[in-house]
């Protein structure tokens, strides 16, 4: 079937902000979908609330709406645009749920809009747990014994009949939110209660647990002619019981027999045919390893996280093909876009092994519950490709970037075998390292299999890695050089081989060089070399044949940003992608190195050449030595890329833009402090300390409160405001490792307005596209603050000072390209908080709201131009006639035992933007886009305010009462408010907890004296609010801003939704 000519205009719904369970993979799939439809001459309209995405760039769709993903907003956009169809399968669960709500409310019928690729009936059959179960039984596909429950009593009856454990899966939720495995009646009641509340339709599936069975996924495509193919099948290393997003995954599956593979393949094709899905679909199975029994776990009737992984693993652009199918094409009419020589009907063939490892946020949250279950906790993932499992696994582990060297965690070296086996029983993020350590201690595969139920094939692979370690350590080894070569080919890093053998790294490198041990580069071409590929991508391997054609063209390498994590999100992938595009425009060949399967940067057609590799110095240098580029850009890939600057510099690599010396100066506390003194720019009083005694002395001189943090951080990790000696002592012993190499920085905490300045510099002149002001005062991490463009309260003399200081710093640091500076204004002086000589997380939003292509201009400077040639002027650009408000989004409900208070440690996983020509409406849109309900008629508000904020909170609480809120309070706050004439009811903690659980509290304002202290009353209240999705503000500035949103709602102000182009007319 050719293109459907009746489709003239299509609305694509994005996925909104990044959060746990829904991250960059939907920017990748949404961008592909927009491009695929647009190139058919169909008008594309995109709605998405996430300004950090490539898909919200003005050229990706004909019209781009950065507006809240709410029924109200999208209905108004449909009314205005009148699309013929909607693509809802490329924006994750958010888009699917929104499309279903619009369908059920009659909006799609009213405006004669079709759901393309998947109809509402298929969505219901896949997403509604009861309908799904009924369909599977109808087509004779096995599902576990289960019931659909909407009340706790039904759950208890089921367990009384069939026993524990059971798995609880809420309907229409994301990343397993609200679900879990219950092994006791107490757990059953708690998880079921939470799951029913978190499901948008109040429904959960309760099913008999098959924990311990193998978990497998099949990525399937189907068209309207009923052509079906399997793109890729994947196997979770962890058995059923761990969410697939939290599991180590291999592609293709490694342990299935041919019979098992085809049995599940047949089932997957039968399911997609009966659901009548046209496009992509992900089907998850559980397989009993002791028999041929299997069950169908669930179906995602859309492009998913696993689709992104399958796309990159197989080299098959699932989202692009699915979008083409949705507008009428069939698989046999489409080409494979990687080979351009074969049909999209051919199933990809993989002659390599792919390993995905999740990236968890536990390095930031040391109090978090690390147990992995059916509710996803990972923020991102890495993918590695090699010719065998062992090499791919070691490459993936290296890609995680933490303080990890091979399959080793230092802390396990001091544990007993019994402790290790106890640790291995529990499914958590460290289990694979505990397994490796158990093998080092002589525990055998059989014993570990009994404890973990991980297939012996995988355990044998891990054991072979440990055997290699033992061979390297063997004092009687007569041919150590041979063992070193063997280890390198297996995937060991030079640093790890040096550590194991106690030899210098230089000596190891020499042995490898003398023996000409260098990697070759193999292609991902979807067809195991059967057809010639036009746009393949590459991975390294220690084999003989090199499939990589290196040209003499002038080329530039961009270092990617690695896995999505808190503090380094999709914004940096945005910068890398724009960097690659600008390099092409400047007449160079673009090369990107990255390891994140979720992103646009690792799409097959983004750069001229993609290397899917670990961002470890060994791997990066192998590519640079092979390609011999004109230079390397590190300023777009966040702290990951910046951290490579030192090693690249020492290896003689030319870093384009700001020099390594300047990067180091900005990061080095003492050197930078001296520079500020020379430039006469005020800074908060601070010191670097390397011992407890020095810390006490420093605080004596500076005075409490202080901000403490390690040097070289990302996202404010292990950063805290400290108010007294006890808190300082606790921080120094628990949060950081003190040493002369890693000093701790202690700064005076200055309370004031925080300001963000992003600038482009050519070494002489600067261009500041806009100045952004934070709503929350200092002490809250910039990534967690509500941020306004343009600035709202700053006097002209302060703005002049900001421009002057920024110019001085750019010149002194000889910045070429992008730089971000954070300032604080305390009402009298402007102080520099920090300087980042690189792209920041505000570059995408600032580029969009000012119309200045910041990354493109930076690349033009890096390739020889200056600002005056580029046509955007110099110094501070005049503000556009619009207001933009960036609102952070958190995944608090996903991470048990983590405090939600806002402080200097970044916690948000994503962001949204509210944009309007009216400032108050922009704030309203921002809160709505962040998923926060804005009530018109008040509700029940609980307040508990720390002493220093009490007086300031009075007019704010009074305003809430005027807006119809009944006030409940803690004892201390209640007494204070009553004295101020505010009517309130004091609630004991137990009563409050019950009220939150019963849904009787709508909003909480709780400014903690000391956040992050597990076990306190405030911590318990904040956690309960997170788990039951009750809005909680921990900063009174946020609570004050929310009043503005309520005001807009109460006044029924006319809220208009505009395409971005309308603001630039």
Swiss-Prot record:
<feature type="binding site">
    <location>
        <position position="822"/>
    </location>
    <ligand>
        <name>ATP 2</name>
    </ligand>
</feature>
<keyword id="KW-0665">Pyrimidine biosynthesis</keyword>
<feature type="binding site">
    <location>
        <position position="169"/>
    </location>
    <ligand>
        <name>ATP 1</name>
    </ligand>
</feature>
<feature type="binding site">
    <location>
        <position position="242"/>
    </location>
    <ligand>
        <name>ATP 1</name>
    </ligand>
</feature>
<keyword id="KW-0067">ATP-binding</keyword>
<keyword id="KW-0436">Ligase</keyword>
<feature type="binding site">
    <location>
        <position position="298"/>
    </location>
    <ligand>
        <name>Mg(2+) 2</name>
    </ligand>
</feature>
<feature type="binding site">
    <location>
        <position position="836"/>
    </location>
    <ligand>
        <name>Mg(2+) 4</name>
    </ligand>
</feature>
<dbReference type="GO" id="GO:0006526">
    <property type="term" value="P:L-arginine biosynthetic process"/>
</dbReference>
<feature type="binding site">
    <location>
        <position position="300"/>
    </location>
    <ligand>
        <name>Mg(2+) 2</name>
    </ligand>
</feature>
<feature type="binding site">
    <location>
        <position position="129"/>
    </location>
    <ligand>
        <name>ATP 1</name>
    </ligand>
</feature>
<dbReference type="InterPro" id="IPR036914">
    <property type="entry name" value="MGS-like_dom_sf"/>
</dbReference>
<comment type="pathway">
    <text>Pyrimidine metabolism; UMP biosynthesis via de novo pathway; (S)-dihydroorotate from bicarbonate: step 1/3.</text>
</comment>
<feature type="binding site">
    <location>
        <position position="781"/>
    </location>
    <ligand>
        <name>ATP 2</name>
    </ligand>
</feature>
<feature type="binding site">
    <location>
        <position position="748"/>
    </location>
    <ligand>
        <name>ATP 2</name>
    </ligand>
</feature>
<comment type="similarity">
    <text>Belongs to the CarB family.</text>
</comment>
<dbReference type="InterPro" id="IPR005479">
    <property type="entry name" value="CbamoylP_synth_lsu-like_ATP-bd"/>
</dbReference>
<dbReference type="GO" id="GO:0006541">
    <property type="term" value="P:glutamine metabolic process"/>
</dbReference>
<feature type="binding site">
    <location>
        <position position="298"/>
    </location>
    <ligand>
        <name>Mn(2+) 2</name>
    </ligand>
</feature>
<feature type="binding site">
    <location>
        <position position="298"/>
    </location>
    <ligand>
        <name>ATP 1</name>
    </ligand>
</feature>
<feature type="binding site">
    <location>
        <position position="284"/>
    </location>
    <ligand>
        <name>Mn(2+) 1</name>
    </ligand>
</feature>
<feature type="binding site">
    <location>
        <position position="836"/>
    </location>
    <ligand>
        <name>Mn(2+) 4</name>
    </ligand>
</feature>
<dbReference type="Pfam" id="PF02787">
    <property type="entry name" value="CPSase_L_D3"/>
</dbReference>
<feature type="binding site">
    <location>
        <position position="834"/>
    </location>
    <ligand>
        <name>Mg(2+) 3</name>
    </ligand>
</feature>
<feature type="binding site">
    <location>
        <position position="834"/>
    </location>
    <ligand>
        <name>Mn(2+) 4</name>
    </ligand>
</feature>
<feature type="binding site">
    <location>
        <position position="754"/>
    </location>
    <ligand>
        <name>ATP 2</name>
    </ligand>
</feature>
<dbReference type="GO" id="GO:0044205">
    <property type="term" value="P:'de novo' UMP biosynthetic process"/>
</dbReference>
<feature type="binding site">
    <location>
        <position position="241"/>
    </location>
    <ligand>
        <name>ATP 1</name>
    </ligand>
</feature>
<keyword id="KW-0028">Amino-acid biosynthesis</keyword>
<comment type="function">
    <text>Large subunit of the glutamine-dependent carbamoyl phosphate synthetase (CPSase). CPSase catalyzes the formation of carbamoyl phosphate from the ammonia moiety of glutamine, carbonate, and phosphate donated by ATP, constituting the first step of 2 biosynthetic pathways, one leading to arginine and/or urea and the other to pyrimidine nucleotides.</text>
</comment>
<feature type="binding site">
    <location>
        <position position="175"/>
    </location>
    <ligand>
        <name>ATP 1</name>
    </ligand>
</feature>
<feature type="binding site">
    <location>
        <position position="779"/>
    </location>
    <ligand>
        <name>ATP 2</name>
    </ligand>
</feature>
<feature type="domain" description="ATP-grasp 2">
    <location>
        <begin position="673"/>
        <end position="863"/>
    </location>
</feature>
<feature type="binding site">
    <location>
        <position position="243"/>
    </location>
    <ligand>
        <name>ATP 1</name>
    </ligand>
</feature>
<feature type="region of interest" description="Carboxyphosphate synthetic domain">
    <location>
        <begin position="1"/>
        <end position="401"/>
    </location>
</feature>
<feature type="binding site">
    <location>
        <position position="750"/>
    </location>
    <ligand>
        <name>ATP 2</name>
    </ligand>
</feature>
<dbReference type="InterPro" id="IPR011607">
    <property type="entry name" value="MGS-like_dom"/>
</dbReference>
<feature type="binding site">
    <location>
        <position position="822"/>
    </location>
    <ligand>
        <name>Mn(2+) 3</name>
    </ligand>
</feature>
<protein>
    <recommendedName>
        <fullName>Carbamoyl phosphate synthase large chain</fullName>
        <ecNumber>6.3.4.16</ecNumber>
        <ecNumber>6.3.5.5</ecNumber>
    </recommendedName>
</protein>
<dbReference type="InterPro" id="IPR013815">
    <property type="entry name" value="ATP_grasp_subdomain_1"/>
</dbReference>
<feature type="binding site">
    <location>
        <position position="298"/>
    </location>
    <ligand>
        <name>Mn(2+) 1</name>
    </ligand>
</feature>
<feature type="binding site">
    <location>
        <position position="176"/>
    </location>
    <ligand>
        <name>ATP 1</name>
    </ligand>
</feature>
């Amino acid at each position: 079937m050719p293109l459907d000519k009746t489709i003239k205009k299509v609305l694509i719904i994005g996925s909104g902000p990044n959060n746990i369970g829904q991250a960059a993979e939907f920017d990748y799939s949404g961008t592909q979908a927009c491009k695929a439809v647009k190139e058919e001459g169909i008008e594309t309209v995109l709605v998405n609330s996430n300004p950090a995405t490539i898909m919200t760039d003005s050229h990706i769709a004909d019209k781009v709406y950065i507006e809240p993903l709410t029924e109200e907003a999208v209905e108004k956009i449909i009314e205005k645009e009148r699309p013929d169809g909607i693509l809802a399968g490329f924006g994750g669960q958010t888009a699917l749920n929104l499309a279903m709500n619009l369908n059920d409310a009659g909006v799609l019928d009213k405006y004669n809009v079709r759901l393309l690729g998947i109809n509402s009936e298929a969505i219901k059959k896949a997403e509604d747990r009861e309908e799904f179960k009924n369909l599977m039984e109808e087509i004779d596909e096995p599902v576990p014994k289960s019931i659909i429950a909407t009340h706790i009593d039904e759950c208890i009856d089921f367990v009384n009949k069939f026993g524990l454990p059971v798995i609880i899966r809420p309907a229409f939720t994301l990343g397993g939110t609200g679900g879990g495995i219950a092994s006791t009646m107490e757990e059953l009641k708690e998880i079921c209660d939470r799951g029913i509340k978190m499901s948008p339709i109040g429904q959960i599936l309760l099913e008999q647990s098959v924990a311990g069975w193998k978990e497998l996924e099949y990525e399937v495509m189907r068209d309207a002619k009923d052509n079906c193919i399997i793109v890729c099948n994947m196997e979770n290393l962890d058995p059923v019981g761990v969410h697939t997003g939290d599991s180590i995954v291999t592609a293709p599956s490694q342990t299935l027999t041919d019979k098992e593979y085809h049995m599940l393949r047949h089932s997957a094709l039968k399911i997609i045919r009966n659901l009548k899905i046209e496009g992509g679909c992900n089907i998850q199975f559980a397989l009993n390893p002791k028999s041929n029994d299997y069950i169908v776990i669930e179906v995602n009737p859309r492009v998913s996280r696993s689709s992104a992984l399958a796309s990159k693993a197989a080299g098959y652009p699932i989202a692009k093909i699915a979008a083409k199918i949705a507008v009428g094409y069939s698989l046999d009419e489409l080409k494979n876009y990687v080979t351009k020589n074969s049909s999209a009907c051919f199933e990809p063939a993989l002659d390599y092994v792919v390993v995905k490892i999740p990236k968890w946020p536990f390095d930031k949250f040391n109090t978090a519950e690390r147990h992995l279950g059916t509710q996803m906790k990972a923020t991102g993932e890495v993918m590695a490709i090699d010719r065998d499992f062992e090499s791919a696994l070691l490459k993936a582990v290296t890609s995680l970037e933490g303080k990890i060297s091979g399959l080793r965690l230092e802390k396990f070296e001091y544990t007993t075998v019994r402790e290790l086996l106890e640790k291995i029983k529990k499914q958590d993020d460290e289990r694979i390292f505990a397994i490796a350590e158990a093998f080092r201690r002589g525990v055998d595969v059989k014993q570990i299999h009994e404890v973990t139920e991980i297939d012996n094939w995988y355990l044998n692979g891990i054991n072979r890695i440990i055997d290699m370690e033992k061979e390297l350590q063997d004092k009687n080894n007569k041919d150590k050089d041979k063992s070193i070569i063997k280890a390198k080919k297996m995937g060991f890093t030079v640093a790890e081989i040096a550590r194991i053998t106690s030899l210098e790294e230089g000596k190891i490198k020499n042995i490898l060089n003398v023996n000409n041990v260098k990697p070759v580069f193999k292609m991902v071409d979807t067809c195991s070399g059967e057809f010639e590929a036009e746009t393949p991508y590459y991975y390294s391997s220690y084999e003989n044949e090199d499939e990589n054609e290196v040209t003499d063209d002038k080329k530039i390498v961009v270092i990617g940003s690695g896995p999505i994590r808190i503090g380094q999100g999709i914004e940096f992938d945005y910068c890398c992608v724009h960097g690659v595009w600008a390099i092409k425009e400047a007449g160079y060949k673009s090369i990107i190195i990255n390891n994140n399967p979720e992103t646009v940067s690792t799409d097959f057609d983004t750069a001229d050449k993609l290397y899917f590799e670990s961002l470890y110095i060994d791997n990066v240098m192998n590519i640079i030595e092979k390609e011999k580029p004109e230079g390397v850009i590190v300023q777009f890939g966040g702290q990951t890329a910046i951290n490579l600057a030192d090693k690249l510099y020492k290896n003689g690599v030319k870093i384009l833009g700001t020099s390594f010396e300047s990067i180091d100066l900005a990061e080095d506390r003492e050197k930078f402090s001296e520079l500020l003194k020379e430039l006469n720019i005020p800074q908060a009083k601070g010191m670097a300390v390397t011992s407890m005694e020095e810390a006490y002395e420093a605080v004596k001189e500076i005075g409490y409160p202080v901000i403490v943090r390690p040097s070289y951080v990302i996202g404010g990790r292990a950063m805290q405001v400290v108010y007294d000696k006890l808190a300082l002592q606790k921080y120094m012993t628990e949060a950081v490792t003190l040493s002369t190499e890693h000093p701790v920085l202690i700064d005076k905490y200055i309370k004031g307005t925080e300001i963000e300045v992003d600038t482009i510099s050519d070494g002489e002149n600067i261009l500041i596209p806009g100045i952004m002001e934070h709503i929350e005062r200092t002490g809250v991490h910039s990534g967690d603050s509500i941020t306004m463009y343009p600035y709202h309260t700053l006097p002209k003399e302060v703005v002049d000072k900001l421009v002057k200081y920024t110019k001085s710093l750019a010149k002194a640091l000889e910045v070429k390209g992008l730089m971000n500076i954070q300032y604080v204004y305390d009402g009298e002086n402007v102080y520099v908080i920090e300087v980042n000589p690189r792209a920041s997380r505000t570059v995408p939003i600032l580029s969009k709201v000012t119309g200045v292509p910041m990354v493109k201009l930076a690349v033009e400077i890096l390739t020889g131009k200056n600002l005056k040639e580029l046509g955007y002027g110099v110094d501070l650009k005049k503000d556009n006639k619009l207001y933009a408000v960036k609102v952070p989004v958190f995944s608090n409900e996903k991470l048990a035992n983590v405090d939600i208070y806002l402080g200097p440690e970044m916690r948000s996983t994503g962001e949204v933007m509210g944009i309007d020509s009216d400032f108050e409406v922009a704030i309203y849109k921002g809160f709505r886009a962040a998923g926060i309900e804005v009530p018109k008629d008040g509700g029940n508000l609980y307040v508990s305010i720390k002493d220093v904020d009490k007086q300031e909170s009075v007019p704010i609480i009074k305003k809430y009462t005027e807006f119809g809120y009944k006030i409940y309070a803690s004892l201390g706050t209640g007494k204070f408010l009553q004295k101020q004439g505010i009517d309130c009811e004091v609630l004991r903690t137990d009563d409050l907890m019950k009220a939150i659980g019963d849904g009787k509290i709508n909003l909480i304002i709780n400014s903690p004296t000391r956040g992050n202290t597990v076990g306190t009353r405030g911590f318990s209240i904040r956690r309960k609010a997170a788990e039951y999705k009750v809005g909680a503000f921990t900063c009174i500035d946020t609570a004050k801003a929310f009043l503005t949103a309520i005001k807009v709602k109460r006044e029924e102000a006319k809220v208009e939704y505009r395409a971005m182009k309308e603001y630039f007319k």
